[in-house]
Amino acid sequence: MHSTPLIMTSSLVIIFTLLIYPILTTLSPSPQNPDWGLKQVKQQYKLAFLVSLLPLFLFLNEGAEAVITNLSWMNTHTFDINISLKFDHYSIIFTPVALYVTWSILEFASWYMHADPFMNRFFKYLLTFLIAMIILVTANNMFQLFIGWEGVGIMSFLLIGWWYARADANTAALQAVLYNRVGDIGLVFSMAWMATHLNSWEIQQIFFSSKDMDLTLPLIALILAATGKSAQFGLHPWLPSAMEGPTPVSALLHSSTMVVAGIFLLIRTSPLMENNPTALTLCLCLGALTTLFTATCALTQNDIKKIVAFSTSSQLGLMMVTIGLNQPQLAFLHICTHAFFKAMLFLCSGSIIHSLNDEQDIRKMGGMHHLTPFTSSCLTIGSLALTGTPFLAGFFSKDAIIEALNTSYLNAWALSLTLLATSFTAIYSLRVVFFVSMGHPRFNTFSPINENNPAVINPIKRLAWGSILAGLLITANILPMKTPVMSMPPLLKLAALAVTLLGLLTALELASLTTKQIKTTPHLTPHHFSNMLGFFPSIIHRLSPKINLILGQTIATQIIDLTWLEKVGPKTISSINTPLISTISNIQQGSIKTYLVLFLTTLALSTLVLLT
């Protein structure tokens, strides 16, 4: 057993070396070959994935619970910071999943970005991102986790704004940074609280020394951090906007890896939450609200990437619900299964978008199963996995989550919202399949559409296998940490499937109605609510600046200029002097009556003075 930590640490060091080596080669003054990314980087990713399987098999074979490696880094009199690596179920399974998904996406990017003059830099950014993600996943202290957290944040900014000549891409990148910065405040606050109250950032030590303390404040800060990074309700608008980045970026960062960092943080710190009902209820209600709101928004979107982005946000809400149920292992299982089919949905979308001359509107697609049968089939598999079709990857995690939710004694409001969102998932997933794959083509005839490129087929094929088998493989090899409910009424057992089927039937009915309709769609508020994203961007991004500008204008021009510089100064002096001036000027009008009255008044006054 003593060799296990050595093998695991060595494997991680080899993975880091394999990923850092291509970045170091770019530092040489001589320019890289155009195929550097395709040949060298893809090869390194493949090797890194194969190396990451070694600790996974070793871990599963030995039945270990966690292996921790500690190296001293910085010591002060009162505070120690170590390089501490934690190999447990979470890090040891997520690392191969992330590498496998990234390897597929990178190969796809070599085709998708082939005309980009800076493709090598793009690959370098993806490498740096993955290194930051692995640091975050394997960290056993808050400081290391923070380094990985900020690393994925800055790479997200650079990759969303990749096409920096486009105003929308720049705006989306800045939006992502600003929303994430709000979340980062939560993480920094919780770290500061831990440093001052617990005098440690080591996660194990924090668990031990905080047993009898009220942790509500730092836990709310951690939930704020997760809300920012994982696009929960309130800080969610950046995720759909991030679709301005290239499709491989959306597939990697904004579906399978970076956006789950917030949920992963809560999974890592879940022992702190176990006995804190405030934090758990907050997670449960926030997750339920997110999953329903974003699923509602996805119902009426027409941009294929936006629909997949909202579905990502909806699934992140479901993971947050699971953490609120105090089932972090189920949330992690959903992270792993979700990574495969969501990345595949994005790659299929990217392939179709490219085939149709960069057309993203699903109303202008249709009949793609005739032209791109493989991509359309995989899009359908991914959509079915997303809805939780039995025995595909999504079923194993989604069904378990909804069973846990149904049999819990917690908030019935959250339960009903989540079930409704599950039904909506089926509706928008089938809507995508119906509009993109089925029916007749609704686009102009372009140059011949060809999907027979290995760089397109192979990545989607690998992710399709993952979408079919990942759930079974992971559930078969991980023992549940909490005892699942062994018996439940058939109604509760079948609730998830029932609402999904209801959603599918609704979607079919709606799709057939929309293809036959003659009248134009009436302007209904619920439709606008969904289509305009709940009026959230309009209120937050438009109304707030507008109110600020109006207030600024009122204060600057009307209050300061009009009141202080005009009314208090010149106008006040004028208003005091005017009556006096008018009185005096009336006397000097040359009237003999006035002069006689003045003469007599003066005479009377002077006589009075003399007599007294």
UniProtKB/Swiss-Prot annotation:
**The reaction(s) this protein catalyses:** a ubiquinone + NADH + 5 H(+)(in) = a ubiquinol + NAD(+) + 4 H(+)(out)
Keyword Nucleotidyltransferase among record annotations: no
Places the protein is found: Mitochondrion inner membrane
Coiled-coil segments on the chain, per record:
none
Q: Tell me, which GO biological process terms does this entry list?
A: ATP synthesis coupled electron transport; electron transport coupled proton transport
Q: Name one GO cellular component term.
A: mitochondrial inner membrane
**Record GO terms (molecular function):** NADH dehydrogenase (ubiquinone) activity
Q: How does it sit in the membrane?
A: Multi-pass membrane protein
Task: Tell me its EC number(s), please.
Answer: 7.1.1.2
- Give TM regions: 4-24, 48-68, 92-112, 122-142, 145-165, 183-203, 215-235, 247-267, 279-299, 307-327, 330-350, 376-396, 410-430, 463-483, 494-514, 592-612
- Cite the InterPro entries for this sequence: NADH_DH_su5_C, NADHpl_OxRdtase_5_subgr, ND/Mrp_TM, NU5C-like, Proton_antipo_N
Q: Keywords on this record?
A: Electron transport, Membrane, Mitochondrion, Mitochondrion inner membrane, NAD, Respiratory chain, Translocase, Transmembrane, Transmembrane helix, Transport, Ubiquinone
**Pfam families reported in the protein's UniProt record:** NADH5_C, Proton_antipo_M, Proton_antipo_N
Asked if the record carries the keyword S-adenosyl-L-methionine, the reply is no
User: What domain of life is recorded for the organism?
Assistant: Eukaryota
Function statement: Core subunit of the mitochondrial membrane respiratory chain NADH dehydrogenase (Complex I) that is believed to belong to the minimal assembly required for catalysis. Complex I functions in the transfer of electrons from NADH to the respiratory chain. The immediate electron acceptor for the enzyme is believed to be ubiquinone.
Q: Which family does it belong to?
A: Belongs to the complex I subunit 5 family.
- The protein's name is NADH-ubiquinone oxidoreductase chain 5
